[in-house]
Design a protein with these regions (language model features):
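ATP-dependent adenylation/nucleotidyltransferase module used to activate substrates
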Residues: 1-161
Length: 161
């Protein structure tokens, strides 16, 4: 869906971090209702159940959740393959590990940097996510959200509706 909202005489374009979960779908819907051009982006780290199942020789029973979500929204998903670049993040996270030994804050910074690069290369204005304040004990608390915004290089260009 193309938006009609204009900024300085041109269409406003947003990159939507689409995980396939309800929060990112709702965030995309809010942007679309504001007549903002939305490009859904999914950064593939390779560390998913789908990858595990493929490596085990099991065929996927359905398209990945981000693909299903984009289709439901009537949008074409952009997938960024970042597996190799992601390995150092999980081996030595600057901000430590989350409760399940996952590098929550570092992961968010990494994903948003990948999306920021795509955003800049494709002349989009900002990025939005489906993050919810205090929904996760490490990465979605106000101080962590501020660190992620700053260290991803998206100060003033990251919206969490």
């Amino acid at each position: 869906m193309r938006g009609e909202t204009r900024r300085h005489g041109r269409e406003v374009k947003a990159v939507g971090m689409l995980s396939g979960g309800l929060d990112s779908i709702l965030a995309a819907r809010v942007m679309l209702e504001q007549d903002i051009h939305v490009t859904p982006v999914h950064v593939r780290t390779g560390l998913t159940y789908a990858r595990r199942n493929r490596l085990a020789g099991r065929e996927p029973s359905a398209p990945p959740a981000p693909q299903q979500a984009a289709q439901a929204l009537g949008l074409e998903l952009v997938t960024i393959d970042a597996f190799e670049a992601y390995i150092p993040v999980i081996l030595d996270p600057q901000h430590g590990y989350g409760s399940a030994m996952n590098p929550c804050v570092d992961c968010r910074i990494f994903l948003l940097r990948q999306a920021r690069q795509w955003m800049e290369e494709h002349d989009h204005d900002f990025i939005f996510t489906g993050e919810v304040l205090a929904q996760r004990p490490n990465s979605q608390m106000r101080p962590s959200l501020a660190v992620v915004e700053r260290e991803s290089g998206l100060e003033g260009r990251l919206l969490r509706p």
